[in-house]
Amino acid sequence: MRDARKDAIEMAARRERLLEAGFRLMSARTIEAVTLQQIADEAKIGIATLYRYFKAKPDLVIEIGTNIWKRYYVEVEKEYARLNGPAMNAAEELEFFLDSIIELYRSRRDVLRFNRNFDTYVQHERCTAAQMRPYNDAVAVFAKKFHTVVRKARADGTIDIRVSEPKLFVNLLYTMLSVAGKYAEGLVYPPDGERDMTDELEAIKRMILGSLT
């Protein structure tokens, strides 16, 4: 007699192996360059089994992207709590979010490389709104967190807000993510032969904060 609980655990473990293998390969190369067969081989799982979990490559890619941002959000929330985020003023909280992106560059450049390639891939594949919903929901929580910055700014005046909240969110955090992603991919020629662009990201952060405070 089959053990349903054991089967469920084994299925979840195989799924996770496929997701981890896909992320490893796609962040090291590009999403387009990696085939499902290569992912199955990397995970040491048969291709037929892979197709039982993911009907097509975009399904796997979107789940990888969704999981990345869900896990990152948990990490950000832990650090926010550790630093007593609710007690921060708006400028301090904005700096916290910018620092969170810089920390991604320091410690998880693979995430930034995958993320840079992700948007291009899903647009090329013409993924539907229904397909993208889990991913968009995972990203939307950051916009909700950013709302706290705006609410505090209106109360304490430590940030000068002259544009709408959505524009501010996109202009600041997405721009920072985009630049960090380019640095992670090595697409920006490093000054003086330096390969670590952390100082450049810190300079961008200071310019952003200086323009708003």
Predicted segments, located by residue:
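Short amphipathic alpha-helical elements of helix-turn-helix/winged-helix folds
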Residues: A21-L25, L104
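Amphipathic alpha-helical segments used for helix-helix packing
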Residues: Y105-A129, G181-L187
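N-terminal intrinsically disordered/low-complexity leader segments
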Residues: M1-A13, Y80
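Hydrophobic alpha-helical connector segments
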Residues: E63, K78-V111, E165-L172, L201
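C-terminal peripheral helix-coil segments that are non-catalytic and often amphipathic
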Residues: M1-R2, S100-E103, A140, K144-D156, ...
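Generic hydrophobic, amphipathic alpha-helix propensity
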Residues: M11-G22, I39, I64-I68, Y72, ...
